[in-house]
Amino acid sequence: MRLSSMWLCSLLLILKLQLSSTYPISTGLTDTDMDILKVLLSRLEESVSEQMAVDQSAPGQRDLLDSLSTEDAGDGPQPDAGLDEAEIREFLSAKNLKSVRNDSSRRSSGCFGRRMDRIGSMSSLGCNTVGRYNPKQR
């Protein structure tokens, strides 16, 4: 009985796989939706080909625009010219980055992160620890 039921289940499974592969899963798009997408795709291809033709026919104009933009940029004031390179290095130094990372507002948040000295001590781990033992206060 067990062998026949297993054989029947495997036959049904194979049949199910064959039937499901013959009918593709519907994408939810109708024929009109597909037609609209095809029209949009063809319009996109046309506009891209037109733009490529314009770009290839006018390389001299692009060079002219690039030269004008570099000349305009040179005439204006430089925004970062007043900063000294040493000041920039000092601002980005590891000491300053460490002080940002060890900000006192983070250390005194009151929620986790305080140090536990030994097992059983009141270490103020957790939230709402106002008024509890703090070894720094003594």
UniProtKB/Swiss-Prot annotation:
Alphabetic keyword roster: Disulfide bond, Hormone, Secreted, Signal, Vasoactive
Molecular function GO terms recorded: hormone activity; hormone receptor binding
GO cellular component assignments: cytoplasm; extracellular space
Record's signal peptide: 1-22
Disulfide cysteine pairs (residue numbers): 111-127
Record's function text: Cardiac hormone which may function as a paracrine antifibrotic factor in the heart. Also plays a key role in cardiovascular homeostasis through natriuresis, diuresis, vasorelaxation, and inhibition of renin and aldosterone secretion.
Identification of the protein by name: Brain natriuretic peptide
Gene: nppb
